[in-house]
Amino acid sequence: MGGDLPYRDLNSYLKGRFGERVQKITLDAGLTCPNRDGRIGTGGCLYCNARGSGTGAWDRGQSITAQMQMGIVRLARRYGAAKFIAYFQSFSNTYAPIAKLRKLYDEALAFPQAVGLSLGTRPDCLADDVLDLLAGYARDRLVWLELGLQSAHDATLQRINRGHDVACFTAAATRAAARGLEVVAHVILGLPGEGPQEMAATAAYLGRLPLHGAKIHLLYVVNESGLASLCQSGDYVCLTEDQYIQRVVDFIERLPAHLVIHRLTGDPHPEELVAPAWCLDKPRVLQRLRDEFDRRGTRQGSYFVK
């Protein structure tokens, strides 16, 4: 665990691995998603809008090189960091021809300060040639493959229009891990139709896979998404802050102790957020999570079952 925290936090893990603070630089490569370009669908996932959690940097004409340069300057000034992970976040960052992907990744890794690569993507966007490319990078640097699962329940995945099933994620995570890649599962708590039991079952599912880490995200509502329509009609109600605190602690208690927790809530763009307003106060949410672990006297792995 990191310091005296009740879970294995990312910052402590990175300091242990690299001997100093490491920061992620968020990159927008102007890519798309098979759930938007027509290969699987066109509307995207229920909670996603047309910006796909992106920064819009690519559309503003900023190359990967420019984004890296600006990120290094900004994060070095703010945190005193000298090492960075190139984090391709927007849309599906393994969904393009292999030559294009190699060029994008190489451009980010050309900076001597870049010690690793993190790619947000879908489990159905992992062709063998992409995995082989990433395995090559992983021989001498950190490579995280952040795979979107969201839920371990097929009924939920259908409800949110994911376009893949749980078996697809299982196969993708297993194939990636077999090549030596570090897989981070992205899950969302508060999805429509899910209660405490379903969320806890997703945690148990993660514990059976060859994962490096988990990224836990609150389901918040952004404008121009399908979820926004459901929220405005009253057909979806966000978790309260108290409910979210309980569900996250329940979740982490059921994860194996070795998994690195990459995220514990979300960081919505304030101008896009419809609800819930409480998620904008991230420091308070994180402190309340720690307080709840203290109240229960538990920590990550307390209720993990092999």
Question: Residue ranges of each PLM-predicted region?
Answer:
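Hydrophobic faces of well-ordered beta-strands that scaffold small-molecule active sites
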Residues: Q23-L27, F84-A86, L117-L119, V143-L147, ...
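Structural recognition of alpha->loop->beta junctions
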Residues: C45, E107-A114, A201-K215, V285-R299
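N-terminal [4Fe-4S]-dependent radical SAM core
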Residues: M1-I85
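Core AdoMet radical
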Residues: R51-G71, L75-I98, P112-L126, L142-F169, ...
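Auxiliary Fe-S-binding modules of radical SAM enzymes
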Residues: M1-S12, F18-Q23, G213, V221-K306
